[in-house]
Amino acid sequence: PTHLHVIATVQDLDLEKRATRFDEPVGIAFANNQKAYVALSSENKIAVIDVASRLVTKHLSIPAQDPRALTVRHGKLYVIPFESNNKTQLSGGYKIDGDLVTFDAHQHSIAHNNVLSLGHVLDIIKHPRVPDKDLFVFDTETDRLIETVDTLGTLLYGLTVDSKGTVFIAQTDARNDVNGRSGTKKHGLAELENRAFLNQITRVEFQKNAAKKPHFIDLEPLPPVHPKPGQAFATPFAVELSPDDKTLVATAAGSD
């Protein structure tokens, strides 16, 4: 009688504030028959759920924006944030150096109304000190964070893990820094070459829980070479491996 029927729901309510703590659940994965994980995208957390009681027992903090896709393989939970960043930011600061800092951010945004202030030289730059955390690996037995991997892409969509623990991530890497020198070098759309993102699959191998250097599989030629008409891809989204690990299958979201 319960076939294809909802048999239960999971909620986590703050009774004093009359608000949910189970906000924007997106991805789900099971550690085993007793424990499940749910990505709470807008909360930047993973809810840990006891399957038998259907109650949230705790949360895992994800210090990145919008964790969505997650999967479990061989006792490890793998989580990627959707908007992971790519170290880019406006070139503001205090001491202007003409490279990473091209305008006084305090004078522009705090001391004066930034809508009224004129004459500031604004670039989009890649700053080495900006965090870019892209992959989080947890031990499903203890829920302890094992490893964090940086710089795997900008918008991270789907992930899968093979039998050896190699991670594959469907992602698009933003090129907003390619024409970012709009202030100092007067960059415009021409420098972007109509390629705002690179469509890629990122491959990450591990050795004793430590990530090796990632490998980027380009789905299209890299600029200045461009795909021929009819050969460009839409956004790489879902990704999955065949049971024998020999074939990687991905979808292109937005394809006609």
Predicted regions and their residues:
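Short loop/turn segments that connect beta-strands within beta-propeller blades
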Residues: 2-3, 50-54, 139-143, 206-209
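Beta-rich, blade/repeat-based domains predominating
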Residues: 15-32, 63-73, 132, 153-162, ...
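Conserved loop/turn motif of beta-propeller repeat scaffolds
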Residues: 33-34, 74, 164-165, 245, ...
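Short, conserved, GDST-rich strand-edge loop motifs in beta-rich repeat architectures
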Residues: 80-129, 169-199
